[in-house]
Each structure stands twice: as structure tokens, then as C-alpha cells.
């Protein structure tokens, strides 16, 4: 997959994208990420990329010309190198659709993505109307710009691309992939400061271990994210276990 990030602050990405899983995916040429500085495409003398909003109001708004010129340069590169002619253009915005695991799975099937990071009070609406295919939000809170949301999206999507993780099971058992929160994890030592690993995990009985993990996931989800259970298909054993949990309240 190829991901192009349109941003005013490309240096923000070097740390998060230059380590761990994302770094290895790029070294193995499974993933190619390039941050493109929008300011480089400003046609005015001082490389100015923002201006006061029409109608008044606080803050500054990113002007359309540098963003659209940056986008057109990226699209031309895709076309010249026989990549995707029209990749999705995702604007990271608090007004966008809430990002979740299902969306990450869909995006991981794309060959290329262009991510647009806003700043200041946002970007000129005409840019959104002209080039943006999707607006995505990572949550109901305010951030300084779209760079951190872009990193979140890249990390969530990249780990779903075949070959990025060493084992598919690594993400299939994680929180949200199955629809439930992940069960607690334990490693050595068996006892730490008086706290022991649950006996079932050292029993060698794999069916009991699976049952324990399933029940732990159900209980955690019930207490912390009950909204996830509304659309989750429960087995009869799941339903019985949850009834027992409810009776303890």
C-alpha cells in the first residue's frame, strides 16, 4: 500500500512511522509512506498557506491553492507510475465519520490512500468539495491538527495489511477485531508481588483456556463497553455467562 500524507508538519511523522511494525513494513516494501509538505506548493512569495476567514471569526483558515496543487502533484505521480488513478482522499476532521475497526479493515484493502491534515481553524470548504472523498474523525475531542489522527489511522490500517504482522492471529484476537474487548494477558514470572497468574492459563487445558479468555472478554466488554454487545452475536453459553454477571451486580 502507498500512503501519501499532505501536511504542514512532515517532521512530526518521523518518530512514530520510523519505528516498530510500521518501520519494518516499509523496509519490507509492504508499505510506502511519504509525507508531502503543503507549504512547498504555495505560489505566493512568502509561502503563506493561511488567511483570515470570510465573515469574520477567530483563527486562520488554510487556503485552497497550496492544498489543491499539492494534491494534483501527488495524483500526477500516481498516474505517471501506473499506480491508482484516483485514490481515496481522506481529510482528518472532527466533523468526519467516527473511525473504527470496521473502517480500518475497509481502508486496508485499498492500494493507495492520500491523507489530508488540516491545521489552524481548518481548511477552505472548496478544497473538501473539490478533492476530498472521505472525512474521518478519531474521536469527539479537539486536537491541534490532523497529524496525530493521521498517525492513528496509518497504524490501525497498516497492521491489517497482509504480511505486516508476523501472524494473522496477532490482530484477530485483539480488542475490537473480534467485536469484544481483549482478555487480560500475562507472562513470566508466575507470581509478581503476591499476584499470581490465573491457574487456568498454566493448566495446559486449551479448551479451558479458550473458555476463560472468552468469558473475560465478555465480562470486560459488559462492564466497560456495553454498547459493543448490542450488535454482537452471542452464543447460548455467552448469554448464560452474561446473565450470571448481571446477577452479581
UniProtKB/Swiss-Prot annotation:
InterPro entries: Alpha/beta_knot_MTases, tRNA_m1G_MeTrfase_C_sf, tRNA_m1G_MeTrfase_TrmD, tRNA_m1G_MTases_N, tRNA_MeTrfase_TRMD/TRM10
Spans traversing the lipid bilayer: none
Gene3D superfamilies per the UniProt record, alphabetical: 3.40.1280.10, tRNA(m1g37)methyltransferase, domain 2
Subcellular location: Cytoplasm
Reported function: Specifically methylates guanosine-37 in various tRNAs.
PANTHER family: TRNA (GUANINE-N(1)-)-METHYLTRANSFERASE
Protein name according to UniProt: tRNA (guanine-N(1)-)-methyltransferase
Gene assigned in the entry: trmD
Amino acid at each position: 500500500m502507498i500512503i501519501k500524507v499532505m501536511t504542514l508538519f512532515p517532521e512530526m511523522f518521523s518518530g512514530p512511522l520510523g519505528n516498530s511494525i510500521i518501520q519494518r513494513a516499509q523496509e519490507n516494501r509492504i508499505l510506502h509512506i511519504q509525507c508531502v509538505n503543503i507549504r512547498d506548493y504555495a505560489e505566493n512569495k512568502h509561502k503563506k498557506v493561511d488567511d483570515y476567514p470570510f465573515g469574520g471569526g477567530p483563527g486562520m483558515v488554510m487556503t485552497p491553492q497550496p492544498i489543491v496543487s499539492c494534491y494534483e502533484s501527488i495524483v500526477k505521480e500516481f498516474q505517471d507510475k501506473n499506480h491508482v488513478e484516483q485514490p481515496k482522499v481522506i481529510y482528518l476532521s472532527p466533523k468526519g465519520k467516527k473511525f473504527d475497526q470496521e473502517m480500518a479493515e475497509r481502508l486496508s484493502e485499498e492500494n493507495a490512500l492520500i491523507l489530508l491534515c488540516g491545521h489552524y481553524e481548518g481548511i477552505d470548504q472548496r478544497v473538501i468539495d473539490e478533492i476530498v472523498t472521505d472525512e474521518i474523525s478519531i474521536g469527539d475531542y479537539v486536537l491541534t491538527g490532523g497529524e496525530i489522527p493521521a498517525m492513528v489511522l496509518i497504524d490501525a490500517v497498516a497492521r491489517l495489511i497482509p504480511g505486516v504482522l508476523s501472524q494473522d492471529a496477532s490482530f484477530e484476537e485483539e480488542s475490537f477485531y473480534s467485536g469484544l474487548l481483549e482478555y487480560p494477558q500475562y507472562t513470566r514470572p508466575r507470581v509478581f508481588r503476591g499476584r499470581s497468574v490465573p491457574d487456568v492459563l498454566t493448566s495446559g487445558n486449551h479448551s479451558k483456556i479458550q473458555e476463560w479468555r472468552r468469558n473475560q472478554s465478555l465480562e470486560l466488554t459488559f462492564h466497560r463497553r456495553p454498547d459493543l454487545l448490542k450488535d454482537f452475536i452471542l452464543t447460548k453459553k455467552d448469554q448464560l455467562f452474561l446473565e450470571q454477571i448481571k446477577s452479581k451486580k
